[in-house]
Amino acid sequence: MASLQASRFMLTTSCSSCTRTRSAISIPKLPKFNVSIPQIPIKNRNFRVEEPILRLDGFAEDLDLSLSERQRQKKRGCDDQVLQRSRLMAVLEEVIDRVEMHKNIGEQRNNWNSLLLNSVNMITLTAALMAGIASMNASGIDSVSAVSIASTVLLASATGLAALMNKIQPSQLVEEQRNATRLFKQLRNRIEMVLREKSEDGISEEDVKEAIKRVLCLDKAYPLPLVGTMLEKFPQEFKPATWWPETKPEPTHSRTEANGWNSELEMEMREVVEVIKSRDAEEYEKLGNVALKLNRVLAISGPVLTGIAAVSSGFIGHGSGLAGVVATTCASLAAVVNTLEHGGQVGMVVEMYRNSAGFFSLMEDTIKTERRENGQVFETKVALKLGRSLSELRDLARRSSLSRFDGSSWSKLPSDLLNMVFERLGFADFQRAKSVCPSWLDASRQSASKNQIPWLIMFPEKGFFGDIPRQIFETQVNYDVLANGVRRVRPELGNVFHIKNTHLVVTMTGETLRVDSIIRSDSDVWSFCIYQMDSSNSKWEKLTSLGDEAILLDQGITVLANAIEGVNRNSIYFSGVQFQYGYVSSEKDICVFNLNTQKVERPYRNISSFIQSCDARWFVPNITRT
């Protein structure tokens, strides 16, 4: 810097001694100086260092390190954290105060319930006793009038007190304050946990706003005053309690494996929500509606009975003993009704169901919104709140998924859609679809099963070939014979007259038939007996005719014969090898048993002679319309 100042001084002196012959003053250029500023080791990387700026009056160093600005921002941040912490502490103080208030008011209203119940019952029973005495002592007119008037006044007072008591439902008020005390204690623990966990990171304004919202929601769900803000005790519809603020679900991309969430856990939580919605919540809402209706009936019956007793007691001593009977009976019944309603605390039961239904709604909302809590911790909390272990919770979710997959959701399909499905099914699939569930069975009765043309398949002696080239599919035919190594012989089993087989056949209308087939042991003569179940006595009755249907015994079904060319009505189609016993010549026979003539026919001899087959089967192809 000393050298710089010296150069500047020399420059000024030379300028003053210049000649005046020139018209302009020429200021010489300043020499260039390479000024190197040593690098200072700085730990804080937030400092900003700028190069010196040359000005007319010299060099002006601008080393803006913004240290003071950073300090001011840090101070403002600390002040904001202190402010938010103070606000949250103020909310905590209000929560603690509300815990004590709801606890004290709950005890007070519990005293109301017991005192009012005892007072109303004592007044009612005393008035009933006085009405009975007045009706017995009808000879003394003056004394009867006095006792009757006193009884009327007492019963009228009991009517008013009972109506007031039924209006406010003290037992329900007590349960409201119990729930409010418990929930405010939970909120207090929640705020204290936030204050502990965020002592270093700092409390945000969102934490304060959320705490305030929860306080206001609890105040709305469980109000302290009776006038103006008291909850409706007899609403038209039972609704669960709601004491939590509405939350928005967080985006799916925030779910990470590192936070304990995975696809299996998310699926498990969704199944738990379905169980809560379909089973627990519906059950408690149903029970709540029943308790609400019962409480409404009891609340109306008590004052009505005491009112009738009060009116009847006013007519005691006027020449009729019926007034005394009505007064004493109604007053006694009123005491019983009041004891059942308030001694049994039916209002408390209604509030308990309302709070329980609200709890399941809260669980459903909590799982759906999925606050970004660790997945495993969240699963543990859900299991404990539902009163289950982790293994039981996972088993519940798995069984719920399987039950919905197995048919509970299929049973809710609309009938129009089911009819469209049934129209595209073959006969066999149509019969299978009917057995899925009762709703499908009802829908199948509106849809006629599709009548298909039966096909006949022939099994060649040397194999079964199809459309696939150079492929032969072997089949095996079993024989019940004894062999001597050279030829088959029929075993001598004694005097065997019949061999009877029983088959079940499903008709076009879905009814079940029993078909007994009979064959002689020494011939190929068949006969059949058909039986139908009588639903009135659950016994099989013999059926003589199939009408326009024909039985395909190989498939166990019937087809509509008059709609298919070449199929005879009131007949049974079968292959002879199924019923053969020791008689070989008819293995490849394709037979028809006519129920009208009771004879077996072989209408397809030309097919049997053309194809060297060892067996034949009737079947209905499963060709569906798309």
From Swiss-Prot:
- Enumerate the spans annotated as F-box domain: 407-453
Top-level taxon in the UniProt lineage: Eukaryota
Coiled-coil ranges (or none)? 171-200
Keywords from the named record: Coiled coil
SUPFAM superfamilies assigned: F-box domain
Has the keyword Oxidoreductase been applied to this entry?
no
Q: What's this protein's name?
A: Probable F-box protein At4g22030
Record organism: Arabidopsis thaliana (Mouse-ear cress)
